[in-house]
Amino acid sequence: MGKGKKGGKRMNKAQLTEILQQFFAERPGETLSFKEIFRSLHLTTHPLKMLAIDIMEEMAWDDYLAKVSDNSYRLNQSVQVMEGKFVRKANGKNSVIPDGEENPIFVSERNSMGALNGDRVEFTFLARRKNHIKEAQVNKILERAKDTFVGRLKVDKDLAYLVTPSDVFAHNIIIPRRKVKGGKTDDKAVVRIIEWPDGENKSPIGEVVDILGQKGDNDVEMNSILAQYGLPYKYPKNVEDAANKISGEITEQDYKEREDFRKVFTCTIDPKDAKDFDDALSIQRLENGNWQVGVHIADVSHYVTEGSIIDKEAVKRATSVYLVDRTIPMLPERLCNFICSLRPNEEKLAYSVIFELDNNAEVKNYRIVHTVIESDRRYKYEEVQELLEANGVVDGTGEPAPAETKEHPYEGENALQLITLDRLAKKLRAARFKNGAVKFDREELHFDVDEKGKPVSCYYKRSKDANKLVEEFMLLANRTVAESIGKVKKGKKPKTLPYRIHDNPDPQKLETLREFVVKFGYKIKTEGTKGATARSLNKLMSDCEGKPENNLIQMVALRAMMKAKYSVHNIGHFGLAFEYYTHFTSPIRRYPDTMVHRLLTKYAQGGRSANEKHYEELCEHCSDMEQIAQNAERDSIKYKMVEFMGDKLGEEFDAHISGITSYGIYATIDENHCEGMIPMRDIADDYYDFDEKNFCLIGRRHHNKYQLGDAIRIKVAQANLEKKQLDFALAGDSAPVRKEKPAASTSSKKTKKSKQKTRNHRRNK
């Protein structure tokens, strides 16, 4: 900084505070005397020196500085120098999340050192200013989250640029012409950084790795979403070649070593567009009157050897990714859709949990075994639902079909087996909720797309009894497998296993939920045992079911819940009310399930406990990849939402407020469930304050209020596909009306002048 800027008479306290913060942050280990500070910052006048001393004293009170002597200070490193993850936001509200904490700390752009979203950084706290939020300053970028980025190319004569969303880079990436790889303006491209910025205003330099194609093409846009999150949009040829060499033949040795379930009624029940069938159910009546139910899971670990090229690719991916119009599988297509998939009328290898259940669905005994099965029928959820309802089931009531009689036999192919499975599943479900499981039945947005991937309709999809039938038996199998390894005699250490864990809700977020639902006339307990909290949540879900605010309350309630994740350190699963729970039932699309299969086999053969540290690292990786896959899925939904509304500009719709922020209102259209934002700048009738605690905006002058859940009328104002952003405007009776100020009379003008004089007089005192 120049002398004039640092030592000039016009420098105020805020400016000098910022200069001192930066000065100490750049010299973390040094003790600095007043003399050195004044000389380095060119503070030549007595008032500036005195102001600097006062500021440093305040910084010491804030623990930003440590006082070494009467005339020297140093940065308080023991308190201030920390590490964490940087979070970049498009609106400029960047933050850093310290390691081991959840609450973000604001970082202004000038203090970010050009850190990118997800980068690991070293940072220091800035001294708090009066009435100012806690701030941090990035001092060092420890590790970049990634080095490849997706954007739109702009190719000029001498240089090219990659235009990226503002939440990725503050500046575009410069690409030398020789590194463009034939890309043209408006091509979507993947670019690798070859030179990182070393200053706030310097753009990064990159090279094109892959040209995805022209923007706007459906395949290009979906692949862009995958590439943006570092997810693979191509399957490596060498991995596919390895998969093509795997034989799907079942050998005589396989038949000898496995239980044979080929003659027992078995079926798969899946979504209508499913191709990878990784679970099947079998059922038969035992001589003692009980039911034998088999939960049969594709035996992926039989075909995918640990450490093989296919396994390494599966570890890297960790999960299949489900975008609106496509699935990006964890395993090569030959394995996931053919060899491993439990296709009808084909003999398949499975890993099975075989239960003996009485008529109350109580487990009398079980065994976990390798099997050979042959599915008799591939059912779609809709087909099973139709069969259940044709035999007297009323969806959502929890009641099974009436008993079969000679006069009223069950209708439909395999009706007895499917209705019995449904009846047992409903008993299991009732017992689970009685035990304290939390009931969330939030609807999911789905799109129907044409052959070009363009959305033609969108709708909410709700889980029905047919879905719940399958879900309950999968939950039972997962819990049973976890108990078989984790539940040991007191004093004995269980062998290593990846668990699916879910911690208790955050008490503070539960209190926020309580305050929110009170406005709709509901109550919730935030204190007491886990069971009491769960029962209270379930009552809330039951009370608001079918009401306009149902989805909204479910959304806010979900925010109060902790995220489920994988870990070898078991703490139970709050949402399901299980002490032991794992993922065993989907090895085609989830890598943790494959890990569990391998460990079960190892332990069944008398193997020693697996390396805990190694499996915990794998669990963390799988949890991270699950979150990344969910983010990509959400982005594909946002893109299709904007695309669907793109030809409806200017049209008006009824909507409900689904989110309130300091920068605008989120609204969901009642008719098609598409969500957009009404920017704060467009609500022009007043200046609105954001009341975070009460989820509302309140006008300062006219006291108009916009509350979460309010019914409003909106107009589609803008549909920006590149940003995946829908902008709405308030319309009809909801539109803001700017109230004109009454003309000021002469006397009122005098009063105004008099008040201004009084204010100026007070200011000058």
What is the role of each PLM region?
Residues N103-S108, F169-I175, H673-F690:
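A short macromolecule-binding patch
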